[in-house]
């Protein structure tokens, strides 16, 4: 047995499913998950000593690549001053100033520890501010594992085939209305049915938890208009897209102004950080200035803030996002060309540093139904054959892939060459 197999066997006796987040168990593709020893740049190294070109990037945070020296040094320096204080620090102020400067729609920001905390807190705030209970989310979109959001969810919930999680009381779920992504008609119908009851829409501006599904041109502006018409708040969940699709996020890329924004992943540079923020009048409703309660023992942790501050300063450097887009476009075009040579029907969606691979005869993939019609079994074979070639993709047909600026042209070319060999075997 390999070291990964031995560790996985031991882990399953101690940790549910052997992992601390379900998708890591390779449930969506079968087989034994890799146990990682270290990572550097665009590469992961497993406990058996094999190197992989990494397109998971810790599920999004590693936009600069693994083990970036600026982030590593910031963490070491912060740790030498103490691990946690439970009191305000100067770095929290500097971090808030940086985030609000980079994302102009955020007048104020509250730091938390994860994307889930960010989304559940933003929804609570929207409900408190509007005095309404119902929310709209979209089928196949995932906004963390808060109870009200595990209704027709994407990401790991979709991978496990349980988009509606057991353990979520019906009384919670009844306030969550689910519409079809990229379909404004379904959203208007929900508002017309409950015109005075909907507090907010929460949406991934690029749906990255049913693989990678960009918005149609009219979709996000249409959501903004409907929220304005019916007095609801628009929450854009940029946990995945923030600082990746563009410096100011997908909201800037697509030209839509939310009331609240949720951030995670890149904002922590690999440390556990989330954030939510937006309009000053809405954020003023948050405790201690307002009645809507939210708190966290480790929120604004000094080490996490130092990592995030270092990461965002690097991400803000000129040329970063152009490089991400060029590398991702090169990969997408190369995969499509290789698939066509092998007569394999393939769609590759990509925006900025995100991409999604779909085995489908369809011309495009624009919604949950399109994703579910794709050939998941073929993806499983593709995943394992690429893994044998030393390419680590997301171990699920329902998860996006992520590029970093640490990936080289050689890495991209090697990935395309590997895919060409794999397509010949499918």
UniProtKB/Swiss-Prot annotation:
GO molecular function: glutamate-1-semialdehyde 2,1-aminomutase activity; pyridoxal phosphate binding; transaminase activity
Modified residues (N6-(pyridoxal phosphate)lysine): 265
InterPro entries documented for this protein: 4pyrrol_synth_GluAld_NH2Trfase (IPR004639), Aminotrans_3 (IPR005814), Aminotrans_3_PPA_site (IPR049704), PyrdxlP-dep_Trfase (IPR015424), PyrdxlP-dep_Trfase_major (IPR015421), PyrdxlP-dep_Trfase_small (IPR015422)
Biological process according to GO: protoporphyrinogen IX biosynthetic process
Cellular location(s): Cytoplasm
Catalytic activity reported: (S)-4-amino-5-oxopentanoate = 5-aminolevulinate
CDD domains: OAT_like (cd00610)
Classification via Pfam families: Aminotran_3
E.C. numbers: 5.4.3.8
Biological pathway: Porphyrin-containing compound metabolism; protoporphyrin-IX biosynthesis; 5-aminolevulinate from L-glutamyl-tRNA(Glu): step 2/2
Keyword list, A-Z: Cytoplasm, Isomerase, Porphyrin biosynthesis, Pyridoxal phosphate
GO cellular component, one term: cytoplasm
Names of the cofactor(s): pyridoxal 5'-phosphate
PANTHER family per record: GLUTAMATE-1-SEMIALDEHYDE 2,1-AMINOMUTASE, GLUTAMATE-1-SEMIALDEHYDE 2,1-AMINOMUTASE 1, CHLOROPLASTIC-RELATED
Subunit structure: Homodimer.
Family: Belongs to the class-III pyridoxal-phosphate-dependent aminotransferase family. HemL subfamily.
Name of this chain's protein: Glutamate-1-semialdehyde 2,1-aminomutase
Record organism: Salmonella newport (strain SL254)
Biological classification of the source: Bacteria, Pseudomonadati, Pseudomonadota, Gammaproteobacteria, Enterobacterales
Gene that encodes it: hemL
């Amino acid at each position: 047995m390999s070291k990964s197999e031995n560790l996985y066997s031991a882990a399953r006796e101690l940790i549910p499913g052997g992992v601390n987040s379900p998708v890591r168990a390779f449930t969506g593709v079968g087989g034994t998950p890799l146990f990682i020893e270290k990572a550097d740049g665009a590469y992961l190294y497993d406990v058996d000593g094999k190197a992989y070109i990494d397109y998971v990037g810790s599920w999004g945070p590693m936009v600069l690549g693994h083990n970036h020296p600026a982030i590593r040094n910031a963490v070491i320096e912060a740790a030498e001053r103490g691990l946690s204080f439970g009191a305000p620090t100067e770095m929290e102020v500097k971090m808030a100033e940086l985030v609000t400067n980079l994302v102009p729609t955020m007048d104020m920001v509250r730091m938390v520890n994860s994307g889930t905390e960010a989304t559940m807190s933003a929804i609570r705030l929207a409900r408190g501010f509007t005095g309404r209970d119902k929310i709209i989310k979209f089928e196949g979109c995932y906004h963390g594992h808060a109870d009200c959001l595990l209704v027709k969810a994407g990401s790991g919930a979709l991978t496990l085939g349980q988009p509606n999680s057991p353990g979520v009381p019906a009384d919670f779920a009844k306030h969550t209305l689910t519409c079809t992504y990229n379909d404004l008609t379904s959203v208007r119908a929900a508002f017309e049915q409950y015109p005075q009851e909907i507090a907010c829409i929460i949406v991934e501006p690029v749906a990255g938890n049913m693989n990678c599904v960009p918005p149609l041109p009219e979709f996000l502006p249409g959501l903004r208009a409907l929220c304005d018409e019916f007095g609801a708040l628009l929450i854009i969940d940029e946990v995945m897209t923030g600082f990746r699709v563009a410096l100011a996020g997908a909201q800037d890329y697509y030209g839509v102004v939310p009331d609240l924004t949720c951030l995670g992943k890149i904002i922590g540079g690999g440390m556990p950080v989330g954030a939510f923020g937006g309009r000053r009048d809405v954020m003023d409703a948050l405790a201690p200035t307002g009645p809507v309660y939210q708190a966290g023992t480790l929120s604004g942790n000094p080490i996490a803030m130092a990592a995030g501050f270092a990461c965002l300063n690097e991400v803000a450097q000129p040329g970063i996002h152009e490089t991400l887009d060029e590398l991702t476009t090169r990969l997408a075009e190369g995969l499509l060309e290789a698939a066509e040579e092998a007569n394999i029907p393939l769609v590759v969606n990509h925006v900025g540093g995100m991409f999604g691979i779909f085995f489908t005869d369809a011309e495009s993939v624009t919604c949950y139904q399109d994703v579910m019609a794709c050939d998941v079994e073929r993806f499983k074979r593709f995943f394992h054959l690429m893994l044998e070639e030393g390419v680590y993709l997301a171990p699920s047909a329902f998860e996006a892939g992520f590029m970093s600026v640490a990936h080289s042209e050689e890495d991209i070319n090697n990935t395309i060459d590997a895919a060409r060999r794999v397509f010949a075997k499918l």
